[in-house]
């Protein structure tokens, strides 16, 4: 699958939001002027149309999870067929991707790094190696680092960073054994209020 290979901080400036594409050792503000969009006229504040707002919100969420357009649209279609609120269903599907869960557990400092661990067969789900990042994790699933990868310095370093952050309440994390469990369904209040999923649903509903 194709992936974005350009400057990651440029994407954060484009969306005027920290997309957590870089390790969390330093704040995004110390790395770039996030309030200034990229380009010659990035400092200009433009009044966006309703469509432009919807498009920017979709791009922000898509880039946050590192997903290309076609796959993101497929998540929307799947979310719209589930019972309940389509916007919340979309967020749940994205949050329960294996690469995101590995990132949330702290095995990787970014979702991209978590994806690399999965591709390199360093991650198990219920004691079986899973090598595709889009794998949908279910409640009560156990996610762990395979034995041969537990000595990787980047995983150990990432876990040290994770210990300093607030732990997701929907996950249990066993640092010594490098494993965690997906405890419960993710509620809307669990996630950032900076995300406006309603704008995305409005965009796709046209």
From Swiss-Prot:
It comes from the Bacteria. SUPFAM superfamilies: Alpha-L RNA-binding motif. It holds the Pfam family Ribosomal_S4. GO terms for cellular component: small ribosomal subunit. GO terms for biological process: ribosomal small subunit biogenesis; translation. Keywords: Ribonucleoprotein, Ribosomal protein, RNA-binding, rRNA-binding. Residues 96-156 form the S4 RNA-binding domain. The keyword Ribonucleoprotein applies. One of its GO terms (molecular function) is structural constituent of ribosome. Coiled coil: none annotated. Belongs to the universal ribosomal protein uS4 family. One of the primary rRNA binding proteins, it binds directly to 16S rRNA where it nucleates assembly of the body of the 30S subunit. With S5 and S12 plays an important role in translational accuracy. Part of the 30S ribosomal subunit. Contacts protein S5. The interaction surface between S4 and S5 is involved in control of translational fidelity. This is Small ribosomal subunit protein uS4.
